UniProtKB/Swiss-Prot annotation:
Residues 5-184 form the Guanylate kinase-like domain. ATP binds at G12, P13, S14, G15, V16, G17, K18, G19. Coiled coil: none annotated. Belongs to the guanylate kinase family. This is Guanylate kinase. The gene is gmk. Pfam families: Guanylate_kin (PF00625). It comes from Streptococcus agalactiae serotype V (strain ATCC BAA-611 / 2603 V/R). Its EC number is 2.7.4.8. GO terms for cellular component: cytosol. The keyword Secreted does not apply. The lineage of its organism: Bacteria, Bacillati, Bacillota, Bacilli, Lactobacillales.
């Protein structure tokens, strides 16, 4: 039976570049984990693909899934729901495959309460001025929404202490490499591998007895 995979939870403030860094991580063949596509009720942006970037659903559809207990986590952010479908995550982890979640901070804290042995990585901007420039440059939000996102970012950065690692996104390729190193190191933690070696000793003792 395969060992259960790692749940990798990757989040940070809106506009910090989570999606761009995630795409960089998955653009190379050396990653060994699956990406769990999040679900949202926000409008689909130009270039985004349903089922690849997000599962785009109506508010009514999303709320029905919540009532049915089909979401690992969910949060409402700037008037839209974001969340993670539960079935895909459990099925993949049970196969021994790592699952990479790119989710909002609220959702990450929900996951931590349910899966405390996950790997929680917070992506942070070099500073708030650069974060604001990125939000403005994206050209998808009004000045009022951008102001809301900046205030929310301040609150979320204060929650960084709830995470295991903080990675600064000063350059996309470097940030992606840092995240991959964190994940690789997690596979060698003693508390994650001790069971394997304990069983190895027991099996050897049985053969010798």
């Amino acid at each position: 039976m395969s060992e259960r995979g790692l749940l990798i939870v990757f989040s940070g403030p809106s506009g910090v570049g989570k999606g761009t860094v995630r795409q960089e991580i998955f653009s190379t063949p050396d990653h060994k984990f699956d990406y769990s596509v999040s679900m949202t009720t926000r409008p689909q942006r130009p270039g985004e693909v349903d089922g690849v970037d997000y599962f785009f659903r109506t508010r009514e559809e999303f709320e029905a899934l919540i009532k049915e207990g089909q979401m690992l986590e969910y949060a409402e952010y700037v008037g839209n729901y974001y969340g993670t479908p539960l079935s895909y995550v459990n099925e993949t982890l049970d196969k021994g495959i790592d699952v990479f979640l790119e989710i909002e901070v609220q959702g990450a804290l929900q996951v931590k309460s349910k899966v405390p042995d996950g790997v929680f990585i917070f992506l942070t901007p070099p500073d708030l001025e650069e974060l604001e420039e990125r939000l403005v440059g994206r050209g998808t939000d009004s000045p009022e929404v951008i102001a809301q996102r900046i205030e929310r970012a301040k609150e979320e950065i204060a929650l960084m202490r709830e995470y295991d690692y903080a990675v600064v996104n000063d350059q996309v390729s470097l940030a992606a490499e840092r995240v991959k190193r964190v994940i690789e190191a997690e596979h060698y933690r003693v508390d994650r591998v001790i069971g394997r070696y304990t069983n190895m000793v027991k099996e050897t003792d049985k053969k010798l007895s």
